[in-house]
């Protein structure tokens, strides 16, 4: 297997781009046959591919919407707008992956190469967005500002265009690129994205160790890396083995989708653990923090039996201690 050759990858994992790269031995067309596919089912005269994996995609969309709602509810948290972009891109990626895996656009159809190119572009955009989010915690620039938000959006869009264009040109054999030698896809989709993810993880470890007193966020990072790596290993190494041993009911894509979802959830958990709301400027949904601006004169106080009650020093008079601030330890 040479660099840029997808033969070994595609014979084990039924990823969408495998139907568009390489060369078939029978008719000389593009496409690499996978050793084992997950079962298809027929519903209302419609074939649905990768049923178990489709269910996980739907679950991933639901969980992503929940995470977006939780992030948006933290009105004053550091990096709220930036991290929300990560989940929006992941949501779009999950929708496109569901369309491809379920066979809504079947291999060989005219729209299939375009959807596969969009999928690769969204993968690159997601990794780029996550990379830039990694620098928000260092407060090199103010989060939530036009500079911060549009820097993230434009960089993510640029990588989406580059990766999507390279993929589409390769699939269509345009601009001198060939589907029989998809080295450009290997570089943009795998090598560059792997570097971005590595830099993100290292930067967050440096952030936690160098600036935060709490070490618990390292656990979130570790679990996120663990789930992601396990998912990739299962997909690209053991997918065909799993498929054969369970009589084609599931394959590596099913476990890879689960692990990717868990990794994204760890990204949310990590962000939530190192940020907090500024309670002075936020309004909680479930908490009602009342501030007494001016005390009433003694003659205006209403006489009540509760003034001399043993229950006067209630819990509501105790000072509220918010959770520890982590980003507040950093200087602006």
UniProtKB/Swiss-Prot annotation:
GO terms for biological process: cell wall organization; chitin biosynthetic process; protein folding; protein transport. InterPro entries: Chs7. The chain crosses the membrane at residues 51-71, 86-106, 121-141, 149-169, 182-202, 218-238, 248-268. Pfam families: Chs7 (PF12271). Keywords: Cell wall biogenesis/degradation, Endoplasmic reticulum, Membrane, Protein transport, Transmembrane, Transmembrane helix, Transport. It is a multi-pass membrane protein. GO terms for molecular function: unfolded protein binding. The keyword Transport applies. Its main location: endoplasmic reticulum. It is found in: Endoplasmic reticulum membrane. One of its GO terms (cellular component) is endoplasmic reticulum membrane. Chaperone required for the export of the chitin synthase CHS3 from the endoplasmic reticulum. Interacts with CHS3. Belongs to the CHS7 family. This is Chitin synthase export chaperone.
């Amino acid at each position: 297997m040479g660099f840029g050759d997808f033969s070994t990858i595609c014979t084990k994992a039924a990823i969408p781009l495998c139907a568009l790269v390489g060369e078939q031995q029978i008719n000389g067309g593009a496409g690499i046959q996978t050793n084992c596919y997950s079962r298809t089912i027929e519903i209302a005269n419609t074939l649905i591919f990768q049923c178990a994996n489709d269910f996980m995609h739907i679950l991933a969309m639901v969980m992503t919407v929940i995470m977006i709602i939780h992030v948006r509810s933290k009105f004053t948290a550091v990096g709220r707008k930036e991290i929300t972009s990560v989940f929006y891109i992941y949501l779009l990626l999950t929708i496109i992956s569901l369309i491809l895996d379920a066979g809504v656009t079947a291999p060989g159809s005219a729209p299939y190469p375009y959807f596969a190119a969009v999928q690769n572009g969204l993968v690159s955009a997601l990794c780029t967005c996550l990379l830039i989010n990694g620098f928000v915690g260092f407060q090199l620039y103010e989060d939530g500002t036009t500079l911060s938000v549009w820097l993230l959006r434009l960089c993510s869009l640029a990588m989406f265009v580059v990766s999507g264009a390279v993929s589409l040109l390769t699939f269509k054999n345009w601009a001198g690129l060939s589907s029989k030698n998809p080295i450009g896809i290997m570089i943009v989709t795998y090598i560059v994205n792997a570097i971005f993810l590595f830099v993100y993880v290292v930067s967050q470890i440096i952030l936690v160790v160098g600036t935060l007193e709490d070490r618990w966020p390292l656990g979130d990072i570790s679990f996120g890396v663990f789930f992601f790596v396990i998912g990739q290993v299962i997909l690209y190494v053991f997918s065909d083995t799993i498929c054969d041993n369970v009589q084609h009911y599931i394959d590596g894509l099913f476990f890879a989708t689960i692990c990717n979802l868990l990794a994204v959830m760890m990204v949310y958990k990590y962000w939530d653990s190192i940020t907090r709301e500024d309670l002075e400027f936020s309004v909680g949904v479930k908490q009602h923090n009342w501030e007494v601006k001016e005390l009433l004169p003694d003659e205006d106080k209403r006489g009540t039996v509760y003034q001399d009650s043993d229950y006067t020093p209630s819990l509501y008079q105790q000072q509220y201690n918010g959770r520890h601030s982590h980003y507040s330890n950093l200087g602006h």
